Amino acid sequence: MRKNEYVNLPVICLVGPTASGKSGLAVRVCRRLYVDEHPAEIINTDSMVVYRGMDIGTATPTLREQRTVVHHLVSILDVTVPSSLVLMQTLARDAVEDCLSRGVIPVLVGGSALYTKAIIDEMSIPPTDPEVRARWQEKLDAEGPRVLHDELARRDPKAAESILPGNGRRIVRALEVIDLTGSFTATIPDGTLHWPKTVQMGLELSRKDIDQRIADRVDQMWAYGFVDEVRSLANVGLREGLTASRALGYRQVLEYLNGDYDEDEARRRTIIGTRRFARKQLMWYRRDDRIEWFNALAPDLDDRVVARVLTALTTDEED
């Protein structure tokens, strides 16, 4: 893949925990840039927003927002299609190159720290095979993570030492890679940017504010008909979707629909799980000292972010 031929165009990356307001900020910033004659488009990097029909639970940009600013990688996959880190890396990088080739500023939004790094950093990702992963996933569901961890320890002791026995998802991935390549080596980016002129901006909030926003978002999800959305998706294969069925909120509502617990418990577990995920996001993002942090509640947030983009446009800086 060719690198950025438009050396004066930055690649913008907005990061931050769930419910911090990244998506709305991205739309507002792109609109401001357009007025200043600097066209910009949004590239989703969240592995769940790519699924069609998962609108309420993933806070997919509204149709009005998508008409206002061009969005890439939104609602492009059926819920039965597996997603993966390598797929998102490929799709997002292609979208960035498409923007740059047209003289458009790409604005990456969403996703976990791992997905962000896989896209903007030089990172080689081992291959994936849905059938191989499905086989190990079935074994995980039937026998639990410790049995698989024992298998991993037998086949690759070093890999087993690096993965906690209870982390079923990582164990499945490690066994998949071993089946495909013969060994597993955790890939950690060395900090070399794929596009040298990349600017990362993060939104920060207090834990109290994050927790409240998440509770409010989940309440809004339920008010907007989230349970009905999950029920409809279950009718078109959500339960069989290896990736989509694990999305926060969707997994909990599916378990409620299966009779595992009542609706109030599904709602409670969604809030708890989302808060836990947000804290994990922040922990990983804080490890990247290239991220410039902005107060998500600052009244001049939009002005400051736009100013930072304009500064990047007029300088030759490289992170």
UniProtKB/Swiss-Prot annotation:
InterPro entries: Dimethylallyltransferase, IPT, P-loop_NTPase. Its EC number is 2.5.1.75. Pfam families: IPPT. The record marks 112, 133 as: Interaction with substrate tRNA. It catalyses: adenosine(37) in tRNA + dimethylallyl diphosphate = N(6)-dimethylallyladenosine(37) in tRNA + diphosphate. It is an enzyme of class 2 (transferase). Substrate binds at residues 18-23. It comes from the Bacteria. Signal peptide: none annotated. Keywords: ATP-binding, Magnesium, Nucleotide-binding, Transferase, tRNA processing. ATP binds at residues 16-23. Residues 46-49 are annotated as: Interaction with substrate tRNA. One of its GO terms (molecular function) is tRNA dimethylallyltransferase activity. Its cofactor is Mg(2+). Monomer. HAMAP family: IPP_trans. Belongs to the IPP transferase family. Catalyzes the transfer of a dimethylallyl group onto the adenine at position 37 in tRNAs that read codons beginning with uridine, leading to the formation of N6-(dimethylallyl)adenosine (i(6)A). This is tRNA dimethylallyltransferase.
